[in-house]
């Protein structure tokens, strides 16, 4: 029970010190995010990548600072239960007019759980559930920007509105031809509005902060007409001339889901009220969990908090059991899942076969590398948890036996909370989105018969995407290491994503070689490797026997990605990266780029200047998504 009186002389001071720690964290986070605009304007791509890596570390640093201060100044760990009750109440009071209350609650949890015994990990002492609403938070200061801006175009002035909308972001680098680009956007919009009657509420709403990632800036918003809303994003890039261009117009939830995918690096965006951004983005992408939206915005700890709450809610409202995940078992990771829940749980094994020359700390280092690196839409993001408790009754006995055999150091089965419920406690686990393993996806097509048109299309799509995934990883200076089909998965949008990280290396750390010609018949006929192989040596031509055993797969692979078997391909990209070049990787199909859709010599007067006349009757169908 909470105390009826706030009579502690120290509780408020502890709460205030904790709030000071959070405010310092978010100010630093926001400042670094805001600097992304200048880095974009000056084409400081290496600085942008460095800032993205470093910003990930901000949170843990501030949590350590705050917990150290509380112990030093208040001996926080020695305070009574009654004092800690009051600390939470005072903290809630400090959140009343706060602009980031949900983040501050999570920060409170992070600091408190570093100090207190786990018996305190309940809603009386920490925020198991949120205490302060994030609805309708507004910054009332006169100079504050609103979360989003609304524009009210007509059929005649939509092109001018697009120009004004972009100029309102005050980018300090000149556009190559903004009027031309606005005409391109207008043409793309007109494809969705040409047969639509504009209603009284026709408007474009755009979030006030630009979204920066890698070499791009993104205008994010939505078009509203009648009962319909269509998500919209405009990528802004540097052209070869060094000026700015609008590169494409993205429409609809699917385009936005790919842009905000869990397989991409986090955005940098200056947000005064992050919950308002999340609410706006959720209205555009209702199928994207709020946890993943917070992750995409760089607020990964909040994403972890919401994910865990969603997970506990799902456990309470489901009855199926955790099981060994389907597919080929890994040599390093033990993977299990809950069939009704769209994520997998990965535990590092205690023992590895001799060919896996690695350690637990090395594997953790690889996963941290992926977390901090540009994932270019091809490496799944993971959430890392410690001391996770599951109901024992929900675990399949075969799964328990598997963990006891391969990862006994990571397993505890006990009634730790002394509440009469036996739990399975996993010491350390990674959680990531479930995908269809690529080997299973291909096997389904083989089983259907490679002569079937649908199966043939599935094989071609999978193999082409697999090669594209590897080439995108190469562009980002990542060598997957183990390139077997089983280490890649298919997402809901048909994208191939890599998810086995224990052997990844930087391209620049590898030595790509051709297999030397045999010097005699004995070497040529030998079943063993007769040439010297260094620890970082890679022989691309040796990939073929492991990947291309199926004729249908080989045909597609050699047609589209045969260069992956040539050491020269890898060496050329290695040289490019070492020379400091940052490659372009687009979070949308290249066919959507205006440079693909419009010929370079096209005259400006050929572009639309306004929407076509509206039809007499349109019903309620609204816009084409």
Swiss-Prot record:
InterPro entries: AceK_kinase, AceK_regulatory, Isocitrate_DH_AceK. GO terms for biological process: glucose metabolic process; glyoxylate cycle; tricarboxylic acid cycle. It catalyses: L-seryl-[isocitrate dehydrogenase] + ATP = O-phospho-L-seryl-[isocitrate dehydrogenase] + ADP + H(+). GO terms for molecular function: [isocitrate dehydrogenase (NADP+)] kinase activity; AMP binding; ATP binding; phosphoprotein phosphatase activity; protein serine/threonine kinase activity. Pfam families: AceK_kinase, AceK_regulatory. One of its GO terms (cellular component) is cytoplasm. ATP binds at residues 325-331, 346. Keywords: ATP-binding, Cytoplasm, Glyoxylate bypass, Hydrolase, Kinase, Nucleotide-binding, Protein phosphatase, Serine/threonine-protein kinase, Transferase, Tricarboxylic acid cycle. The active site is at 381. It is found in: Cytoplasm. Residues 596-625 are annotated as: Disordered. The keyword Membrane does not apply. It comes from the Bacteria. Its EC number is 2.7.11.5, 3.1.3.-. Belongs to the AceK family. Bifunctional enzyme which can phosphorylate or dephosphorylate isocitrate dehydrogenase (IDH) on a specific serine residue. This is a regulatory mechanism which enables bacteria to bypass the Krebs cycle via the glyoxylate shunt in response to the source of carbon. When bacteria are grown on glucose, IDH is fully active and unphosphorylated, but when grown on acetate or ethanol, the activity of IDH declines drastically concomitant with its phosphorylation. This is Isocitrate dehydrogenase kinase/phosphatase. It comes from Polaromonas sp. (strain JS666 / ATCC BAA-500). The gene is aceK.
């Amino acid at each position: 029970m909470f105390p009826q009186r706030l009579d502690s002389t120290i509780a408020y001071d502890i709460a205030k010190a904790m709030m000071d720690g959070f405010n310092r964290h978010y100010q630093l986070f926001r400042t670094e995010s805001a600097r992304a605009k200048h880095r974009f304007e000056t084409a400081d791509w290496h600085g942008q990548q460095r800032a993205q890596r470093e910003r990930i570390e901000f949170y843990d640093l501030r949590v350590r600072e705050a917990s150290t201060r509380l112990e030093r100044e208040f001996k926080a760990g020695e305070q009574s239960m009654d004092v800690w009750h009051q600390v939470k109440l005072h903290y809630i009071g400090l959140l009343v007019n706060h602009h980031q209350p949900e983040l501050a609650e999570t920060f409170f949890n992070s600091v408190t759980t570093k100090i207190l015994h786990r018996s305190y990990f309940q809603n009386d002492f920490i925020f198991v559930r949120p205490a302060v609403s994030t609805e309708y938070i507004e910054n009332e200061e006169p100079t504050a920007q609103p979360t989003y801006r609304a524009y009210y175009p007509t059929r005649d002035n939509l092109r001018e509105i697009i120009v004004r909308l972009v100029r309102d972001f005050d980018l300090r680098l000149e556009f190559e031809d903004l009027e031309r680009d606005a005409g391109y956007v207008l043409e793309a919009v007109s494809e969705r509005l040409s047969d639509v009657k504009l209603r009284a509420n026709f408007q474009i709403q755009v979030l006030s902060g630009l979204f920066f990632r890698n070499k791009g800036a993104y205008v994010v918003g939505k078009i509203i007409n009648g009962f319909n809303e269509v998500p919209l994003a405009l990528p802004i890039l540097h052209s070869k001339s060094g000026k700015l261009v609008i590169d494409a117009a993205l429409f609809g939830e699917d385009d936005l889901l790919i842009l905000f995918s869990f397989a991409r690096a986090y955005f940098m965006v200056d947000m005064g009220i992050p919950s308002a951004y999340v609410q706006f983005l959720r209205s555009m992408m209702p199928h994207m969990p709020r946890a993943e939206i917070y992750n995409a915005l760089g607020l990964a700890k909040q994403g972890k908090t919401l994910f865990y709450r969603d997970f506990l809610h799902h456990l309470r409202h489901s009855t199926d059991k955790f099981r060994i995940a389907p597919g080929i078992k890994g040599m390093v990771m033990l993977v299990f899942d809950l069939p009704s829940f769209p994520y997998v749980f990965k535990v590092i094994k205690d023992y590895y076969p001799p060919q896996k020359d690695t350690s637990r700390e090395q594997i953790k280092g690889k996963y941290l590398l992926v977390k901090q690196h540009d994932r270019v839409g091809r490496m799944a993001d993971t959430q890392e948890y410690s001391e996770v408790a599951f109901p024992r009754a929900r675990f399949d006995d075969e799964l328990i036996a598997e963990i006891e055999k391969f990862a006994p150091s990571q397993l505890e089965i006990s009634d730790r909370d002394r509440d009469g419920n036996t739990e399975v406690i996993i010491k350390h686990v990674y959680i990531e989105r479930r995908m269809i393993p690529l080997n299973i996806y291909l096997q389904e097509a083989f089983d259907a018969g490679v002569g079937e048109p649908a199966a043939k299309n599935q094989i071609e799509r999978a193999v082409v995407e697999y090669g594209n995934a590897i080439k995108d990883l190469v562009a980002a200076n990542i060598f997957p290491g183990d390139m077997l089909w089983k280490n890649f998965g298919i997402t809901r949008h048909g994208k191939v994503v890599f998810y086995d990280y224990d052997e990844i290396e930087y391209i620049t750390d590898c030595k790509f070689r051709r297999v030397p010609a045999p010097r005699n018949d004995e070497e040529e006929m030998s079943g063993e490797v007769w040439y010297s192989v260094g620890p970082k040596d890679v022989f691309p031509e040796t990939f073929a026997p492991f990947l291309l055993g199926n004729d249908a797969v080989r045909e597609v692979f050699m047609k589209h990605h045969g260069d992956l078997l040539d050491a020269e391909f890898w060496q050329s990209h290695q040289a490019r990266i070492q020379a400091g070049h940052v490659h372009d990787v687009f979070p949308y199909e290249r066919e959507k780029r205006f440079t693909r859709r419009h010929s370079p010599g096209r005259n400006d007067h050929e572009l639309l200047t306004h929407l076509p006349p509206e039809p007499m009757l349109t019903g309620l169908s609204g816009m084409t998504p």
